[in-house]
Amino acid sequence: MNFWTSKSNNGRCGKKIFPQFLSLDIPHLSIYSLQIEENSIFGKTGVKPCDSDLEADMFEYITKTLEAAGYIHYEISSFCKPGHYSKHNLAYWQDKDFYGFGCGASGRINGIRYDNTTSLKEYCSNGPCPVYIDETLAERGMDAIMMALRTKFGLNIREWNLKYQSDFKEQYAQVLDKYREYFLF
């Protein structure tokens, strides 16, 4: 959901509408910033995105409001009531297999990624025709890192080392040294 797409409303609309969503007692919410593309209906009608400061302020407002209402902020964009984590999303954030159904969907079975066509016409004519992605072990390992760092759970380095046949601390020593003050080991 997005409450602060327009530069002109200065976040007022979001702060007015958001409490109404809380009254619905929805068990899981994902909050994303709407990207306004030039050729979209929004772009063509002159809707301007808000600036990054307002976007950050609104995200902070939403985060604090949801946490005060008992939601768990477990991934960059995801919040849930206790016991209502998204099982599908957790699968890819925790480096597990997952299924993707429909036009443009991606999935991973037995460690092999696939993408369905993004062409609705092709998908409707031919059904799912997954294109399998040939990833190296190093590419899969990097993807696992990036996904894990999106969550409050982080990355289990021992498990990563075993699965990707590498030494995380050795492989990323320069990066870790550069940002050591921000990491918890």
Predicted regions and their residues:
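Short amphipathic alpha-helical interaction segments
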Residues: 165-180
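Short secondary-structure junctions
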Residues: 69-70, 178-182
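C-terminal scaffold of the Radical SAM
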Residues: 1-166
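A short, conserved structural fragment
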Residues: 75, 180-185
